[in-house]
């Protein structure tokens, strides 16, 4: 085994603790996340976690207080911090408070699964998929000693340089499998 790919269940998915988007380890399935990641590292296994970031960061997430503070939001307000790809302050603080600490614990790369909106709400015609690939890849390029790696959907022309693409969710059938090479 070279790479362990963990889908959504690494984080809580039940209402009030998580959902499609989640940033807090599911302690029912992973009671000791650092130990789990450490074990994989000791056995030379790379790990990627699945992210569906579109719902932002809710107040029940473990890392919410630090992110809210850095975003100028009173943590007591319990206001969800929206995910806006074009918001440089948000992306910077998201990496600082949530993603980079998980990378330091042992996450090697991310499996992004953005599919909740074609365009950024603040920058006209900015493809969310294209830009999130760029943002994650650039952060890894800037802050790591290893070659950047990202698993995600193709965001359009030129985006191939940032991610290892996948076709997204697929129907389980021979016809669907026959079509996959075109991705």
What are these language model-derived features?
Residues 1-183:
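Catalytic-domain carbohydrate-binding cleft regions of carbohydrate-active enzymes
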